[in-house]
Amino acid sequence: MRARSRAALLAAGSCLMLAAAGCGSGSSSSQSVATAPAQISGQLKVYAYEDGFTPGYVKSFKAQYPKVDLQTQAFSSSTSALTKLRTGSVSPDVINTCVDENAAEEVRLGVFQPLDVSKIPNWKYIDPELKKLPGVMSDGKVYVVPVDAGDGGIQYDPAHVSPAPTSWKDLFDPRYKGEASIEDNPVTAIDIGALAIGITDPLHMDSAQLEQVKNFLIAHKSQFRTWWESDTDEEQLYKTGEIWISSGYRDNAFTVTKNGVPNNFVLPKEGQLEWTCGYGISAHAHNLSAAYAMINWYASVVAETYEANTWHYRIANLKARAQLPHKILVLSGNNQKLSHPIPASEPSNYAEWVQVWQDVKSG
């Protein structure tokens, strides 16, 4: 699984380009989700991580928009999703994307169309800090509405890892050689390596610092049993006892524990990696009115509250966040002020990072 200031309306030129697809002027229209939800109908294709359309989650959307035929397709990784989107093997209306993966790249490649936020009433409740993250907007236009977020930290099995880890350096502790894992993601892995060797601002590393991180990760490659690729992959590694400690997320630790294997989560002192995910509308969307309705629903109080209660995600809607019970605030981390949050987003020299990570895995 796994961010997004901006213009309130589309520029007139963009609107002209999208006129055939139903772009509005920013005022209420027949396509506005706030005007006539009962009139919104037709097939709507959503391409997302599996949790983006679990039955309990989308139940309220289906009740609100009974004439919409919701068709869903899941992807397990952002890399495979982007490949399918670029080759045209999938043709969704609404697409799930994450800042720590490839949201900014998808925007650059034209996967998304600019959003008319006047058709997304819940946009005004979205945390302003999340609106600033890469991939949410580009050249003054909004492309992605962030809806959920989470802390990247360390997961561990308390039966095997003691005392509790406090630092990213603990992933490289020789006591856990062969029992550790890091997410197979260039941004995540390189951020962790940088923080472990004392680089405090990994997103702005120069080439010399990147080389330093690469050499460190290669030197410690035998520490790691594997690089985990998906949430399911990581959860299974804990279930089978193949790993004791890993980079991971608060919600993953909750899921592992719920499935019978005690699993704890901590925020390392050097910095916390923050993932943020959201939704955009495909540049080739066929059902714009339903797509806007879906994105507005994803950002709604009811949907956001479900995410916090069910998966213990941080949520983007400030109105929903203010209504959470204290227990859920704590479990989801929505009450926590982070000491050194690091947006898990693509750096400006992302291609160089990708090459470094490839070198680490093949080195």
Residue ranges and their predicted role:
Residues 24-27:
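Bacterial signal peptide processing site
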Residues 48-55, 91, 96-242:
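Extracytoplasmic ligand-binding site segments that recognize negatively charged/polar headgroups
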Residues 18-22:
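C-terminal motif of bacterial Sec signal peptides marking the signal peptidase cleavage site
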Residues 101-105, 244-262:
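A ligand-binding cleft/hinge motif common to bilobed small-molecule-binding domains
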Residues 33-105:
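Early extracytoplasmic/lumenal segment of secretory-pathway proteins
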